[in-house]
């Protein structure tokens, strides 16, 4: 089965951050003999670029896509919005999990971003 890994982030594209996630994921995937990593793609934080790459992969014999990056709480983390748009789905807030996160951050004395959704 063919696998693609998509790493998302402007910081990866411009070289300010090294993409270690896709290497780790690829190493874990090759432990399974029936899976073959056939594509690793880096995409900037752009909804249209994410959707375009996803469309290409889904139409080119890829069985599984692993996506990493763009899932934080800052304004440029738009992976979930891009996926919701691509699959014509709506994002739903899991209130109980959100409350657990808030409690975790409070107990650890970590200030959460106001953009945490």
Where are these regions (language model features)?
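Proline/glycine-rich low-complexity loops and linkers
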Residues: 49, 78-117
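Short glycine-/acidic-enriched loop or helix-start segments at secondary-structure transitions
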Residues: 15, 76-78
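Short glycine-rich anion-binding loops that position phosphate/pyrophosphate groups of nucleotides
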Residues: 10-11, 70-73
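Short, high-confidence coil segments that cap the C-terminus of an alpha-helix
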Residues: 61-63
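Structural motif
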Residues: 44-55
């Amino acid at each position: 089965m063919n696998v693609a890994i998509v790493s998302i982030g402007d910081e990866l594209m411009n070289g300010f951050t090294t993409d270690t996630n896709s290497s780790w994921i690829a190493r874990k995937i090759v432990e399974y003999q029936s899976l073959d990593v056939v594509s690793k793609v880096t995409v900037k934080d752009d909804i249209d670029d994410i959707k375009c790459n996803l469309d290409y992969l889904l139409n080119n014999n890829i069985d599984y896509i692993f996506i990493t990056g763009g899932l934080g709480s800052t304004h440029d983390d738009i992976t979930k919005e891009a996926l919701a748009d691509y699959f014509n789905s709506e994002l739903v807030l899991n209130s109980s999990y959100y409350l657990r996160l808030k409690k975790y951050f409070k107990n650890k004395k970590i200030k959460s971003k106001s953009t945490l959704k």
